[in-house]
Amino acid sequence: MKLCVIIIASLMVASVSGRLRKIKGTELDKKMLLEKLGHGMDIRFEETPRACSKKAGEKCKSNCDCCGYSTLCGYITEGKEVKYQCMSKTSNNKILNTVGLGVNAIENMLSFCFR
């Protein structure tokens, strides 16, 4: 019984590795063909410099509009109206404000601004 399980497992491993090798071979063939034709498969993303134009308190549409490492585009509700503006202060408490500025800086860093 154990021998049967070992044989079946080894056949499955051999089958999977053979299929993976075949898939890898076809990918290499496609890549070599594209290189011969002069087309590479490399895709490069480049982040352009941020074009921040808004200071804290001005209207904004996204985090990329606001200048400052911890300045984000947040919203304020006035009645039923929602206004978006650049803001960096998160709390009146000094400790909570420092933590909030750190969180804002991380969130601002994660907003990739591609233009």
Curated annotation (Swiss-Prot):
GO annotations of cellular component type: extracellular region
Residues excised as propeptide: 19-51
Gene Ontology molecular function: any one: toxin activity
First and last residue of the signal peptide: 1-18
Tissues expressing this chain: Expressed by the venom gland.
Cysteines joined through disulfide linkages: 52-67, 60-73, 64-113, 66-86
Cellular compartments annotated: Secreted
UniProt superkingdom: Eukaryota
Keywords per UniProt: Disulfide bond, Ion channel impairing toxin, Knottin, Secreted, Signal, Toxin
Domain notes: The presence of a 'disulfide through disulfide knot' structurally defines this protein as a knottin.
Purpose of the protein: Probable ion channel inhibitor.
UniProt family annotation: Belongs to the neurotoxin 03 (Tx2) family. 02 subfamily.
Name of the featured protein: U31-theraphotoxin-Cg1a
Classification of source organism: Eukaryota, Metazoa, Ecdysozoa, Arthropoda, Chelicerata
